[in-house]
């Protein structure tokens, strides 16, 4: 494995390979933080709107925007607590939303699968 690339595996749980190490994200993140990271990572580095995330996770909340902001803050903090990831910014704030784009080359297994499947159609 090339340590300058980050591999994200979503098909079998949620693991991240980086720097010669494999991290089972279920060991580091709460269920909600894990779900939020999954949704962001599935968007292939595209902006995910706040409205979409609030409707998906906090539809019945009295203050969904506050809940979203708190959970993004918490997710960023939890990721920084993993020693190998302390210098990587995973989640960028964009106008109207958030974008998952680590500052290293990232390969998500679901994106590879979609590309391979499209090639055989």
Residue ranges: model-predicted function:
Residues 29-38, 61-83:
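DNA-recognition element of transcription regulators
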Residues 25-56, 75:
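Short amphipathic alpha-helical recognition elements used for nucleic-acid or partner binding
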Residues 84-121:
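A short linear beta-strand->loop->alpha-helix hinge motif most characteristic
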